[in-house]
């Protein structure tokens, strides 16, 4: 990324950036920061959206401007946000939060570009990150400052991880499991982000197995298994006769995720078994340990007459990182089981491999800015619970995503097109029911008005915050399955 040298130093070392001085930085397209009329009292994510628009002044001269995702229009010039792109617009009396917020976005993008761009420089990256750490902390008073702190920490971890001199010094933040679960539960109460996928997938499963006596769910990444308690309760409530439906869950774990992951899957099984016993749900649980990321149906215990359901939650908060090759191996093998239903839930982050790391970084910043805005609408930044969730949960979540988007372009490209992959590899879409759509909308009614749900074709639903898509759920079956 090319910054005029003197202007970048002013941006970097100043404790109060004058927008008029910063406006001297002009792109090769003739746009300058003076063209941006920004009201930081409104949603700060719109600054990122303005950078991602065709008029953005942040991209390298030789690269294409980052396009808007999902064919969304009007984001950069929304009258409701006070942000517009026009020639000759002058800044009024600068506000501290406005100047600092804009400067933080510049520095974050500069750090990302310096860490992976054509002119990659570890020393420049280190210096920019050191400056960012001076400017922000996770306990700051604005959304932008706190979000910048989490991205700064995530970029710092990447820098440490890639260090040739001292790779052993890199350590991930480790929090007590009870704190992590508490933070996760708080997030569920603050936002529909997680429960949206759980709810829509569970409803689709209930509908698909309505007349089946034995149900076998193969769960790609079970985590704490919180999704299945509600499914058990629903099965019990409708099983009024003597022949109750039997539920069996097979949870996968991988040696590549370490002993802690294996132990967590086993503990999840104990909790689910105890819960099933307490409500009278016939239940069995198997733990399938994989030595590698490759999956084979021969490792499963299959029972004649069971309706097989494949549950695939990808890269949601608290879910382990799995490579595209691991997901492809799982879904390819799962197809041979002729599953009654495949549920696929994933975050709507634009990860087109051919766009490069900087594009992916900007889109990730865009994604989390929308998440922070949605949290602010439901729980003030001054609330201690909000800080707890950010520290224990959201910070590691940001860091994990930054790790994913640094993968090579060919690998990253797979993340963006799972529905397309399913449709071209022997799976057929299953239509979302009217009941499922209504339940999703009912869930959103419990939260702030900024959340929305839209249909994704005939077989999917998308959770969004204002103009930004956050999470999608889609439903499939093997082409050989008779519905």
From Swiss-Prot:
InterPro entries tied to this protein: TF_GRAS
Keyword terms, alphabetized: Nucleus, Transcription, Transcription regulation
Region annotation (Leucine repeat I (LRI)) ranges: 102-165
PROSITE patterns: GRAS
GO cellular component: nucleus
Renumbered residue ranges of the record's region VHIID: 184-251
Residue ranges annotated for the GRAS domain, each copy included: 95-477
Localization (cell): Nucleus
Keyword Acetylation carried by entry: no
GO biological process: regulation of DNA-templated transcription
Tissue: Expressed in seedlings, roots, leaves and flowers.
Molecular function in Gene Ontology: DNA-binding transcription factor activity
Major localization class: nucleus
Region called PFYRE, residue ranges: 308-400
Residue ranges of the region described as Leucine repeat II (LRII): 267-299
PANTHER family noted in UniProt: OSJNBA0084A10.13 PROTEIN-RELATED (PTHR31636)
Family affiliation: Belongs to the GRAS family.
Reported function: Probable transcription factor involved in plant development.
Protein name: Scarecrow-like protein 26
Species of origin: Arabidopsis thaliana (Mouse-ear cress)
